[in-house]
Each structure stands twice: as structure tokens, then as C-alpha cells.
A protein has these predicted regions:
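Intrinsically disordered, low-complexity Ser/Thr- and Pro-rich stretches
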Residues: 1-2, 44
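Bacterial N-terminal signal peptides that target proteins for export
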Residues: 2-13
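C-terminal motif of bacterial Sec signal peptides marking the signal peptidase cleavage site
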Residues: 19-22
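Bacterial signal peptide processing site
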Residues: 24-27
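Mid-to-C-terminal functional-domain signal that highlights helix-capping/loop sites
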Residues: 30-416
Length: 416
């Protein structure tokens, strides 16, 4: 696993280095050659290595080849990260060989057999480290972003729901999806490709390619299908643990790797300077300028609420600490945010046929104007006439603005 992670982070670091050099002058970031068909890869290509035995994290599989004759985005815009196996920094889907395409599959290993432990299971996990949180059947599950930086997706079934936890480090996008599409349960892997600097996944059942932020199939037989986003929340680990003391924490994978993620290497995160570079339009992988939406800075972190067939983006930097009462798709919702937008969640705000309006009162509590009841960040009424009540979470995505705008060109932006 060390070699695998070094490959991914080395590739990421190269992109950052190029961006840093570009910041020193006015000329645009140089774009490397797209491909080099004559170059022979090293005799020993990168493997999933000595620390993690091959196949121990992922489902053994025979995956159909993606049908490249069916697509909704240009094949040349889907770029494979070669991790140094060719002279080219990336190779487009329109030019990649079948052999290299297969070799790069799951070079970033997803987790198909997750193991969980208690809140103290990861010694490196600090209270300020972000986690992607999910609730089901009275249980809470936490997925540290530092782990998702390395593995990017987790296939699991929780509370009888087949789900996919996803994260793309290049656009800070954390989304939980249902894995069910038209009655079929899909299992997902990593193509090692990116579209508009966002993770491209594939499904084992059809080989189709999926754009992560939108959850949309863009190449293959399922092109046009979308995954259903599920409610989740992002917040610092200390806050999640305080809300859910009995939370389960992903710690590794079944089959002897249950404590794999306790290793100190997983404590490494991405430097804060990356967001500034994205705001300056300097991406680690190419992004089509025609697809950028200037209504917000490209690196603005937004929470996107999707319900009732509508999508609305809430700029977290503008909101700060507060409660935003809004309507999306005809549904009354509220966005709770604290810690300068690092803690964020969204809920339907109708309780027992009464629509509530919320204000932030401090100390992680929110008060509804109608009854004066106090609610915590988990949507639980802890004081007042509605004590014991619970708000229902709404499906969300947390991401850089550029990825949301590309996924949903007609997205609305909430303005106070």
C-alpha cells in the first residue's frame, strides 16, 4: 500500500508543483502532452503492494469492458492518471490502450469489505480532522477524510441499504450514494481517470463510467443514469463524536486488515494552499474553462441540497456560522453550519405539519422561532416543547463550486 499511496500522492504533488511554479508568473499553467503511444511502461508496473495483499480490500471481479460507443461527454475529456507508468502525465480515454486501461483499474484501491471500530480506534485522528458522517437505523458511521483521500470510495451495506461513500481529493467532494440503479445493485471501483478534475468511477456489473460529484454515468451502457444521493454530514471529528458517542469508525477491511487505517500515514492531509490555487483557476488536472461558472469562486466550498427534483448550492464561506432557512424543490429545508462552514448538515424543517424557522444560538445549538425549542447539530430537539423531536436529513453534496457547477449547470445559488 505504501507504493500505491506514494503513486497517488506523487501524482497529486506533481500537479501542485506545476501550479506553484505557475503562481510565480503570469503565464498559464503548462499542460503536458496527452499521450505517448510509443513509450513502453516499466517492466514492473506499480502494484497494490506488500502491506496490503492484492485483492484483500476489493471484490475479486471480472468487469465488462466499457462500451465506448455510448457516451455523454467527449472521450478525450476523460483523462487517466498514469502514475508515472508512461511519459505522459495523463492519457485520454479516446487514446488509451486496453492493456493500460485495465492495468490502471483500481490503482487507487477502494474498500469493499470495510471494518469498523469504536471512537478510539484511530490514534492519529484529531478532533479537528474532518469526517464524512452517515446515520442509519439508529447507528452512526464516520469516514475520516484523510482515509478517503487515499481510497476515495467505500462499498458497503448499512441498514439494508447498499451504499457508496465517495470522496475526490481534487475537488473536496464528499457524497454518499445508494448503489441501487433500476433494481440492480452495483459495486464500484476506481478507473484512475478524472473528468474535469473529478474522480471517475466504474461499476463492476456493466463497466460503465461514472462522474463522482454528479453521480452520473457518462460512458457505457448505463450512460445517463444517476445515482441517488443519500443524506450525510461533514464536520470535525470532535463534533461528530460528541453528537454520536457510540459512533462506528472505519478502521480497515475484513480479512486481517481490520486495523489497517490506524497507521500513521493516514494522518496526512492536503495542505490548505490547494484551495487558493483552485480559486485562481490552477487545477491539478485540466478543466474546460467554458464549463466554469463565474457566479462564485471556483474553489468556494458549497453545500448542495438536492430534493424535489431541484438542486441549490449554499456557499459555506458566505454563511459562516448560522442557520439558513430556504426552500428547495418546493420543500422547506434548513442548513446548519458552524466552525466557519467546516461543520455542515441539512434537514427538512417541517415537523408534525408545522414548518419551523431556525436561528443559531451558539454552542452548537439552534432555536426554532415557533416554539423556542433548542436543536443540536444532529437535528435533535434537546430542550423546549419539541424536546425529543428529530429533523429528517436531506441529501447533500459538499464540494468545490466548480465541480458542482459542471455537474449541474442549472444549479441555483442561495442568496440571503
Amino acid at each position: 500500500l505504501n507504493l500505491l499511496m506514494n503513486n497517488r500522492w506523487a501524482a497529486f504533488a506533481v500537479g501542485i508543483l506545476v501550479l506553484a511554479v505557475a503562481c510565480g508568473g503570469s503565464s498559464p499553467t503548462p499542460v503536458p502532452e496527452a499521450s505517448d503511444a510509443k513509450f513502453q511502461p516499466p517492466a514492473e508496473k506499480p502494484t497494490a503492494t506488500s502491506i496490503v495483499p492484492e485483492g484483500s480490500l476489493i471484490v475479486p471481479k471480472i468487469v465488462p469492458d466499457v462500451d465506448r460507443s455510448i457516451y455523454s461527454v467527449p472521450l478525450e475529456d476523460i483523462l487517466f492518471d498514469t502514475f508515472g507508468t508512461t511519459r505522459a502525465r495523463f492519457v485520454p480515454l479516446s487514446e488509451i490502450s486496453d492493456e493500460l486501461q485495465t492495468d490502471l483499474r483500481d490503482a487507487i484501491i477502494p474498500v469493499d469489505f470495510p471494518a469498523y471500530g469504536g471512537a478510539d480506534a484511530l490514534p492519529w485522528l484529531d478532533d479537528d480532522d474532518l469526517v464524512l458522517g452517515y446515520e442509519a437505523g439508529g447507528e452512526a458511521f464516520a469516514y475520516p477524510i484523510n482515509i478517503l483521500n487515499f481510497h476515495e470510495m467505500v462499498n458497503d451495506t448499512i441498514g439494508g441499504v447498499p451504499l457508496l461513500v465517495t470522496y475526490c481529493p481534487l475537488c473536496f467532494s464528499g457524497v454518499v450514494f445508494s448503489r441501487e440503479v433500476d433494481g440492480q445493485t452495483l459495486t464500484f471501483g476506481n478507473t484512475s481517470a478524472l473528468y474535469q478534475s473529478d474522480l471517475v468511477m466504474y461499476d463492476h456489473q456493466t463497466g460503465s463510467y461514472w462522474f463522482q460529484v454528479g453521480g452520473e454515468a457518462v460512458v457505457g451502457t448505463l450512460t445517463g443514469a444517476r445515482l441517488e444521493p443519500l443524506p450525510s454530514a461533514t464536520m470535525p471529528w470532535g463534533e461528530w463524536r460528541a453528537l454520536y458517542p457510540d459512533t462506528l469508525l472505519i478502521t480497515g477491511a475484513d480479512g486481517g486488515l481490520e486495523t489497517l487505517f490506524a497507521g500513521a500515514v493516514y494522518g496526512n492531509g492536503i495542505g490548505s494552499g490547494y484551495q487558493d490555487r483552485v480559486n485562481n483557476g490552477q487545477f491539478a488536472f485540466p478543466v474546460d474553462e467554458d464549463k466554469l461558472d463565474g457566479r462564485l469562486a471556483t474553489g468556494e466550498i458549497v453545500l448542495t441540497v438536492e430534493t424535489g427534483g431541484a438542486v441549490t448550492a449554499f456557499p459555506l464561506g458566505e454563511i459562516g456560522d448560522g442557520a439558513v432557512n430556504a426552500e428547495v424543490g418546493g420543500e422547506a429545508i434548513v442548513v446548519f453550519t458552524t466552525a466557519g462552514g467546516r461543520s455542515v448538515g441539512a434537514f427538512f424543517r417541517t415537523v408534525e405539519d408545522q414548518t419551523l424557522s431556525f436561528d443559531y444560538q451558539g454552542d452548537g445549538l439552534f432555536t426554532d422561532r415557533e416554539t423556542g425549542s433548542a436543536w443540536d447539530f444532529a437535528g435533535r430537539a434537546v430542550k423546549g416543547p419539541l424536546a425529543g423531536g428529530l429533523l429528517e436529513r436531506v441529501s447533500t453534496r459538499r464540494s468545490f463550486w466548480f465541480a458542482v457547477a459542471i455537474s449541474f449547470p442549472d444549479v441555483e445559488i442561495h442568496s440571503p
